[in-house]
Amino acid sequence: MNKRFAIACSGGAALLAAAGAAQGSCGSAFCVLNTNWSTQGVASDPGSFRLDERFEFVDQKHLMQGTKRISQADDTADTTELRTINRNLLTTLDYTVSKNWAVSVSVPVVDRSHSHIANPTGAATFEKWDFTKVGDTRVLGMYRFDNEKNPVVNQGLMFGLKLPTGDYRVSNADGSVAERALQPGTGSTDFVLGGYYSAPGIHLDSSWFVQGLYQQAVSTKEEYKPGNQFQLNVGYRYPLGHDLQALLQINSLIKGRDSGANAEPDLSGSKSVFLSPGLIYSVTHDFQLYSFVQLPIYRFYNGIQLSVDWAFVAGATVRF
C-alpha cells in the first residue's frame, strides 16, 4: 500500500502557530496558521496562563502530481488513494514566566478517516481506517528580547521538542496496520527552532508579524524518519471595530521527503503556500473567538498525493 497524502497543513503549538503546529507528511494534516497573541502584537503579563482550544477540518480528496491535479484513472500505482478527512482538536496551554520567558505545551487529538483501493488493476481491495487518537505533544520555550528603545516591537526565539506521545501502530477493523505516514504519531522526537517579529502596522491599532520555524527529527523508531519541515508565516491584523479584528495571513510550508525502510520517499514531501483570511472577536479583553479559512495558492507534491482545496479553523483563546 502507498499512502500519498498532501501536507495540507502541518502541526503546531501555540508558540509556533499551531502544530505543530503546527504545529504536521500524510499523518500530519494540521493547519499552518498563527493564532498566538504574542506574535500578533498582543502581550501577555508575567504569571499569566493562556488556554487555546482549536478545531481544524481538513478534507483531502483530490489527487495531485507536482503542481497538477490528476484523476484516479491517471494514477497507475499499486494503490489508488480516495480520501482522507481530518478533524483535529488542538489544546494548548501557555505560561508566561516573566517578561522574557514563556513555556507552552500543546496536545492534539486526531480524528482521521482514510480510504483507498489496493491493487486497483488486479484483485481490487477497498481498505479504510477510522480512528480518534492523541497525537504527538509539543513542549516549547520562548524567549522575548528586551527592546527598551522600541517597546511596541515584539521579537524572540522559540525552541523545544515534539515528543512521540502519539500511537504509530494503529490498525483498522481487519487488523491491517496503517502506514507510518497515516498514523496519529510519527514515533520520532523532533527538535524545533524558530523566531518571530511583530510590530505596529500602518493603520491605527493594527499590527503585522513574521514567524519562521524549522523542525527536524533527532530520534526515530522502527525505520521511519519524517522529513524536515520549514514553515514561514506572515500576517497583518486590522481592527474592524472595538471588538472585531480581521487577520490576513500567508502561510508557507516546505516538507522534506520521509526516509527509512517504512517510509515512502518518492511519495512524500511538498512545497505549499496558503492564503488564510480570518476574523477574531474579543468577547472580553482576555477571551477571544476566532475562525479562519485556509486556501492553497501554490502546491507542489513529490509523486502523487492527496491534496486539499480548503481547510477551516475555529477556536477560542482565554488568558487568566
Where are the regions that the model predicts?
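Outer-membrane beta-barrel biogenesis signature
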Residues: 20-73, 149-150, 154-156
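Extracellular loop and loop/strand-boundary signature of outer-membrane beta-barrel proteins
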Residues: 38, 75-79, 122-129, 178-183, ...
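Residues that define the transmembrane beta-barrel architecture of outer-membrane proteins
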Residues: 47, 85-89, 131-137, 153, ...
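Repeated loop/turn-to-beta-strand initiation elements of outer-membrane beta-barrel proteins
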Residues: 49, 101-103, 148-150, 203-208, ...
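Transmembrane beta-barrel strands of outer-membrane/channel proteins
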Residues: 51-57, 105-109, 157-163, 195, ...
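Residues on the lipid-exposed face of transmembrane beta-strands in outer-membrane beta-barrel proteins
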Residues: 53, 91-95, 105, 139-143, ...
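Outer membrane beta-barrel transmembrane domains
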Residues: 64-73, 220-320
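Outer-membrane pore/translocation modules
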Residues: 111-226
